């Protein structure tokens, strides 16, 4: 019978074992899907934009729509000045979106013959969130100097509560990588577990009850199909939310004064 353990899909397996200087540097299924996500994204956009026709074909139209969508998001959130970060935000959005979508396919030409959702691992989302956080700090200090500290001193706050507000602002800023990463990780993890659980119901009922089990499995199968459609939407929304929050945080580096 098929393995219905909902957690097994998140296991990291070594594909090519490698060790150097006492460190395990093995190429894993997680590494494979990171590379695949990067290569697939580059290839798709190269193919889509190869013609650069005045009247775009479907692939070019999709690429231009995505480009415009992200550009509008950056402009509306971080202002015209924020467009200097467009390549950064666009790369994050596309990488997360493609990674999320790849994880939606149960079987894939990959090690172990099944897909792997890299954004369902906290270490990956934390790395992405830390990249954003450090970018905000480095650019904010570089552009504003000590003026970057205005971020922690909101204007118009009464002096007698200002110390408390400053502490709250600092805690909020320091905790950004955690909230930024956990939101993406938790949504992708929970969604894939639910899909696996309902799909497992169908397999278990069919194996245990035979023909009657197939009839009993119609309800969980319908739920699994509905959840799959919802999960595709969540995959897009989580990429959008991560990119949107990135724009908001970058706006703090550009304009630290409240």
From Swiss-Prot:
One of its GO terms (molecular function) is proton-transporting ATP synthase activity, rotational mechanism. One of its GO terms (cellular component) is proton-transporting ATP synthase complex. InterPro entries: ATP_synth_F0_asu, ATP_synth_F0_asu_AS, ATP_synth_F0_asu_bact/mt, F0_ATP_A_sf. It is a multi-pass membrane protein. The chain crosses the membrane at residues 30-50, 85-105, 122-142, 151-171, 198-218, 230-250. It comes from the Bacteria. CDD domains: ATP-synt_Fo_a_6 (cd00310). It is found in: Cell inner membrane. Pfam families: ATP-synt_A. Keywords: ATP synthesis, Cell inner membrane, Cell membrane, CF(0), Hydrogen ion transport, Ion transport, Membrane, Transmembrane, Transmembrane helix, Transport. Its main location: membrane. F-type ATPases have 2 components, CF(1) - the catalytic core - and CF(0) - the membrane proton channel. CF(1) has five subunits: alpha(3), beta(3), gamma(1), delta(1), epsilon(1). CF(0) has three main subunits: a(1), b(2) and c(9-12). The alpha and beta chains form an alternating ring which encloses part of the gamma chain. CF(1) is attached to CF(0) by a central stalk formed by the gamma and epsilon chains, while a peripheral stalk is formed by the delta and b chains. NCBIfam families: ATP_synt_6_or_A, PRK05815.2-4. Key component of the proton channel; it plays a direct role in the translocation of protons across the membrane. Belongs to the ATPase A chain family. This is ATP synthase subunit a. The lineage of its organism: Bacteria, Pseudomonadati, Pseudomonadota, Alphaproteobacteria, Maricaulales. The gene is atpB.
């Amino acid at each position: 019978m098929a393995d219905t353990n909902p957690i097994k899909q998140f296991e990291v397996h070594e594909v090519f074992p490698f060790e150097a200087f006492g460190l395990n540097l093995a190429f894993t299924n997680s590494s494979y899907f990171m590379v695949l996500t990067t290569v697939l994204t580059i290839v798709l956009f190269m193919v889509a934009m190869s013609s650069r026709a005045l009247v775009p074909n479907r692939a070019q139209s999709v690429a231009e729509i995505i480009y415009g969508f992200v550009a509008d998001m950056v402009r509306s959130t971080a202002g015209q000045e924020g467009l200097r970060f467009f390549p950064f935000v666009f790369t994050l959005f596309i990488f997360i979106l493609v990674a999320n979508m790849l994880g939606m396919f149960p079987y894939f030409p990959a090690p172990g013959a099944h897909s792997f959702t890299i954004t369902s691992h906290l270490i990956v989302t934390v790395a992405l969130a830390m990249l954003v956080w450090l970018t905000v700090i480095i650019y904010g200090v570089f552009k504003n100097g000590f003026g970057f500290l205005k971020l922690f001193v909101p204007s118009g706050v009464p002096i007698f509560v200002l110390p408390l507000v400053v502490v709250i602002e600092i805690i909020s800023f320091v905790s950004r990588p955690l909230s930024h990463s956990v939101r993406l990780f938790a949504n992708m993890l929970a969604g894939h577990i639910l899909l696996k659980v309902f799909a497992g119901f169908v397999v278990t009922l069919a194996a245990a009850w035979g023909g009657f089990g197939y009839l009993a499995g119609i309800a969980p199968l319908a739920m699994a199909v509905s959840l799959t459609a919802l999960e595709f939407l969540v995959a897009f929304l989580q990429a959008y939310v991560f990119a949107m929050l990135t724009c908001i945080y970058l706006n703090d580096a550009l304009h630290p004064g409240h």
